[in-house]
Amino acid sequence: VTLTKKQLFLDFRLQTQACARCPYSSIRDNPIAGNGEYRSPILIIGKAPRKRDDEEGVVFSGRAGKKLERMLTKAELDLEKVYRTYLVRCYAGREPQFGEFAAFKKCQPHTVNLLKLMRPTAVVICGYTPFKWLILRWTREVVDEVGFYRWIGRTVRLKEVWGETKFFIIQGPAELSTKRDPDAESKSIEALKTMKAYVVASQKGEPTPLEMFDLKRRPHTRSQQETFGWS
């Protein structure tokens, strides 16, 4: 029996809601598979749910959601017409730290399944942690949180098990108040505008010139394995 995309997506949500891969599953209220239009060519990925997200079962609720919606509006994008999810889908009573490998590694199959299911034209990476786990972990690039600011506004092309993906990198909306890079919001909005133009052109079958960084998947070094717990 061939399932429709809607049925496959429903199955994905049910699997996420029933997940007990890591200890966070015992303290969450609502595991968050995602929200928005599942048929969208655009997928937005943030770090992890906060308390209000967990209470409402909605991705990017509260102030972070308002900031993201504001940026999308400036790029002439509709929040409800894109699909949003998190790298970690359960609230831990606080934000998970990067060193908590269990949460990120256990949730990784859900993210990969979502990418395979959606096969989005564009993936928007919100912040340092999704950037590290979805892009850097497959390469030999080493970028710390300070170095990440140089990547905001850039586009990365990476070939993975779900196909070639264009990642558009923006600052996470919850971190936009930082003084470290006062231009992070404007660079993020420009990245969203570039992403929209790319998606529209792709849908029309038109040429889509993009300034991209090509990253190839490579074996991890011993240092990366020890530092980040990557295999």
Task: Give the label of every model feature segment.
Residues Q225:
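Cationic, low-complexity basic patches in intrinsically disordered or flexible, solvent-exposed regions
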Residues T2-R217, F228-S231:
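A polyanion-binding, active-site-adjacent surface
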